[in-house]
Swiss-Prot record:
Pathway(s) the chain acts in: Amino-acid degradation; L-arginine degradation via AST pathway; L-glutamate and succinate from L-arginine: step 5/5
Gene field: astE
Substrates-to-products reaction catalysed: N-succinyl-L-glutamate + H2O = L-glutamate + succinate
Manner of cofactor binding, per the entry note: Binds 1 zinc ion per subunit.
Reported cofactor(s): Zn(2+)
Active-site residues (renumbered): 230
One BP annotation, GO: arginine catabolic process to glutamate
Gene Ontology MF terms in the entry: hydrolase activity, acting on ester bonds; succinylglutamate desuccinylase activity; zinc ion binding
Enzyme class: hydrolase
Family: Belongs to the AspA/AstE family. Succinylglutamate desuccinylase subfamily.
Protein name: Succinylglutamate desuccinylase
Function according to Swiss-Prot or TrEMBL: Transforms N(2)-succinylglutamate into succinate and glutamate.
Binding site for Zn(2+): 69, 72, 166
Known EC number: 3.5.1.96
Length: 351
């Protein structure tokens, strides 16, 4: 922490506009700290990384990240509003909270990323022998450090959670859905499904292998209840119908401003769960899908229907109802171009 007070502190106290401050300092911002009248300690760790420590002892350490992809604006707007409410003293926290705007430069240019997809660089994938560093790789390494530091300073026995908030490139038959990272054999939690349902998310995709995502990092390294949460479709700033995110914002607010949040009793019938059937990577320059760019996530295919063509290799649906998630024919060679999923039931692997 710098011994001198950064120039931006007084303006931030007045406006609460940490988003604009971060956008004006795309890759670095000097650390700073101040205390609100209600006793909450505000710590700016870097551009896009701000921590709130309530005056009272907390039982949860909560991370909300957005702008890991800079053009996914609805989650950015939600987090911007929450940060402003906290700094204005309108929202009194009961739990420690770390807010992250992942990639401020990509926000400014209105694209998913600048040089490289940030959400392919976590869990150590930012530093690979023979691969030169760039701003996004450096940023991923720093974000891991900030999350590690935040969790390490929590109260002993505190629960840890990280919700990485996104919107999807294309529409979805299930507008909002979450990705539950691979837990390496540990049970899934019904309580987390209840939290997601309270956010307006009743569709959950269960991953079956390690990943390079921010949410997998927090789950695997820190044991956090962690999810990638897709809240709808990508739209420019000012074009989001924020009423569609009211339940999400209310639930995110309650988690950090209440000692304990009560959710409705668990009912398996309220959820649609899917498990990954397979991953299709792009390995050739010539890669295409037979469906249009308007094809929605969770669109199902009949057994034998063409799903993708990678060079001379066709991929056909090999089970009835095999559904597509995150199709993107423009990914870099070697990266995932498509996930396919099949329905699953809530079973004994849930607690």
């Amino acid at each position: 922490m710098s011994a001198t007070t950064p120039d931006y502190i007084e303006e931030l106290k007045q406006t609460g506009d940490f988003l604009t401050l971060s956008r004006n300092n795309e890759w670095h911002l000097a650390a700073g700290e101040f205390t609100l009248n209600n006793g909450t300690v505000v710590t700016i760790h870097d551009t896009g990384v701000i921590e709130f420590q309530p005056a009272t002892v907390s039982s949860k350490d909560v991370v909300y990240s957005s702008a890991v992809h800079g053009n996914e604006t609805a989650p950015i707007e939600i987090c911007d509003e929450l940060i402003k409410q906290i700094i204005a003293g309108e929202l009194l926290l009961k739990q420690r909270a770390l807010f992250i705007f992942g990639n401020p430069q990509s926000i400014n240019i209105g694209l998913r990323f600048v040089e490289e997809n940030l959400n392919r660089l976590f869990n150590g994938h930012h530093s690979v022998d023979g691969v030169p560093m760039n701003n996004e790789r450096t940023r991923a390494a720093k974000l891991e450090q900030y999350v590690s530091d935040f969790f390490s300073r929590g109260e002993q026995g505190s629960s840890r959670c990280h919700y990485d908030l996104h919107t999807a490139i294309r529409g979805s038959k299930n507008e909002k859905f979450a990705v539950y990272p691979y837990l390496h054999g540990k049970p899934w939690k019904k309580s987390q499904l209840q939290f997601l349902l309270s956010c307006g998310v009743n569709t959950v995709l269960m991953m079956k292998s390690p990943a390079t995502t921010f949410s997998y990092y927090s789950s695997f390294v820190h044991g956090a209840d962690s999810f990638t949460v897709e809240l709808g479709q990508v739209k420019p700033f000012g074009e989001n119908d924020m009423s569609r995110f009211a339940k999400t914002k209310q639930t995110l607010t309650a988690l950090i401003s209440q000692d304990k949040v009560e959710y409705p009793e668990f009912n398996a019938d309220e959820f649609e769960l899917f498990t990954v059937h397979r991953t299709i990577n792009r390995t050739q320059n010539e890669f295409s899908f037979p469906f249009s760019d308007q094809a929605e996530n969770f669109t199902g295919f009949a057994k034998g229907e063409l799903l993708a063509t990678d060079g001379d290799t066709p991929y056909y649906a090999d089970v009835q109802g095999e559904a597509i998630i995150f199709p993107n024919a423009n990914v870099a060679i070697g990266q995932r171009a498509l996930l396919t999923v099949v329905p699953m039931a809530i079973d004994s692997n849930f607690i």
